[in-house]
From Swiss-Prot:
Residues 1-24 are annotated as: Disordered. The modification Phosphoserine is found at S11, S33. It is found in: Cytoplasm. This is Large ribosomal subunit protein eL8. It comes from Schizosaccharomyces pombe (strain 972 / ATCC 24843).
Amino acid sequence: MAPKSKKVAPSPFAQPKAAKTTKNPLFVSRPRSFGIGQDIQPKRDLSRFVKWPEYIRLQRRRKILNLRLKVPPAIAQFQKTLDKNTATQVFKLLNKYRPETAAEKKQRLVAEAEAVANGKSAQDVSKKPYNVKYGLNHVVALIEAKKAKLVLIASDVDPIELVVFLPALCKKMGVPYAIVKNKARLGTVIHQKTAAVLAVTEVREEDKNELASIVSAVDANFSAKYDESRRKWGGGIMGGKTQALLAKRAKAAAATVRL
């Protein structure tokens, strides 16, 4: 027969009693349940579940495809754009040479007509205009004639085939060129929604030094690196899940080789 368990004698020392915490009656506990049909869910980012418009879905798919697929060098070079500081300088200069608006043109023609009526020539009233040149065919003709001093190409032209040949043409003709980020930003210079390409042919005497510094910065980024960009393919970047899977496979393959 198993021996009976003996009871341990209680400690002769007094046990310290835990002090009771008094709760403030003003703060009432209201536990919530976030099950289906229960309390209102906390606010969280639900953008993943939004049904976005078709054009947004298309541009997102296009971006993913450009990352995933192997992109030929001629198209991949449009992913490398002019840096922010130089682009700010360029647009600051371009804004001085914006084409005249309809109101400005009317004002100029009225002033010229009054001058002619008073026996003067039109050139006495209006100075020689210095404007940014735009229009794809016009700019191509200026590049071929080597009249363009700086060419700006938008990186997001659709279809890209419209401008894909321009970097090669500029390099062949020795014309400085730069790929800038936004066709809409180029469009604002010429009072239009978008512009694929702009060219600077002439500037005033006071802006020649600024243009020269911009051209030297642009040449270092694009013309000097043209041969490198001509050989460099783009894309081929997989998503996070695929990269993790490939890393896992590589790790397993390395472990089997070690064995």
